[in-house]
Amino acid sequence: MDLDSLKYAELQRLAKEVGLKANMKAERLLKALKEHFSQQQLSENGNDAAASDAHDSVPPVDAHAATYVTERRGKGRTAKRKLSEPTPIISPTEEKTPQDEGRRGSKRRKVSSAKDTQTPVPAEAFAKENTMEKESGDLNPDSESGPTETGVKGRRTVGKIPRHKGLMKRKPAMRPTTPNFKKLHEAHFKKMESIDSYVQRKNKQMEVLRNSVKELKTLSEKTLKKPEAKAQTKVPSSRASLFSPAVQKTAVPERRRLTQQPVSKSALKDTATFRPTVLTTNKINVRFSQATQDNEYKRSLVKTPARMSPHMPLTSTPGRKSDVRSKAELNRSASTITKTPGATPFVFNGNNSISTTPGTTKKNTFDLKASLSRPLTYKPHKGKLKPFGDAQENTALNKSQTVPSHQKNYKQHQVQTREERRVKHTEDRKQKKEKMLGARRGLVMA
């Protein structure tokens, strides 16, 4: 068979076996294969005189190339395995035709394998032998004479020196070598820093962090102190707490000990340093039995304002607004408290302004004129109003209409007709269409 009669897949396989590029167009592949085989044949004829003597009956170059292709048509490996039988090489054109005619009836695969077994040796075996001899340097002087020796040579190329071993010999870098782990570990240890240096570095880092934290703390303390000083100078807010907070030692009484204030100064300055800690009056126990002995007889648990200590007495009737002691007297009493060596555990420094207690505060009365003078917050209705009776009748009618049909006539149940269903269906479709359009236009449908 010629190369022209082979299929594209077979040509590709042949090219791969020979060692050519197989991924080409059919015409170019054919051309390349023909060139390759012709060159191979020429080199064989030039190099091996014994091969030319053995093959007297070989046809011209093109025919031989064609027959050679048919030899390499099957799987190459199977052919190599079956080469163990020493068979004398016979010309392919003479003896192949009767065998092929006999076996065509059975199976075509057997034909290809038989062809492979008969003649993979003559053309390629010599080429392989030449190359391998150059590499390995085999010394066989009488291997070039005789057809039987060529068969032995072919056997040797296949079995004795496999291709993989040759490649391995050529490329020693491909061999898997186990690394010297000791050297590797030593190199790694050299790269690593010592424990002492590591500890020093860590300590330095920690010191830097601590210093930064200390700086931040000092800054925050300074910033906190500044607003405190400002708050002390400020006038007390009008909204003073009703209840006594936790005991706070203020700076004002200490000053008083050193220098007595004149009597004319107001009592409001006593509350200058007071900052209310209690903002809600819920859940506060109001009994100060130890501190306030005058309220001992009162056992009620009603949440009332904090009972004042005996040092700050009020008038006899707390219900109504009464004549409160003058500011000077209050000031005097406060100064006496500070002067006495305090045996009392609790001193009330809270709400000195008695006007703010709930007993004394007067509720605001409604001012009609002021409310009428203010503008309206709503829009008033203009025009005639509907009569009251008609509106009531309408509501009754609506109510009767809203009663569902199955409640109205439960004895004779109304079956839903086809027309009603159609109407309902059309309405549903309309609604769906509207929703779709709204969604498409980016409108949010409620």
From Swiss-Prot:
Keywords: Cell cycle, Cell division, Coiled coil, Cytoplasm, Cytoskeleton, DNA-binding, Microtubule, Mitosis, Nucleus. Residues 399-415 have a biased composition (Polar residues). GO terms for biological process: establishment of mitotic spindle localization; mitotic chromosome condensation; mitotic cytokinesis; neural crest cell migration. The keyword Cell division applies. This is Nucleolar and spindle-associated protein 1. It is found in: Cytoplasm; Nucleus; Cytoplasm, Cytoskeleton, Spindle. Pfam families: NUSAP. It comes from Danio rerio (Zebrafish). PANTHER family: NUCLEOLAR AND SPINDLE-ASSOCIATED PROTEIN 1. Interacts with DNA and microtubules. GO terms for molecular function: DNA binding; microtubule binding. The gene is nusap1. Its main location: cytoplasm. InterPro entries: NuSAP. GO terms for cellular component: cytoplasm; microtubule; mitotic spindle; nucleolus. The keyword Cell cycle applies.
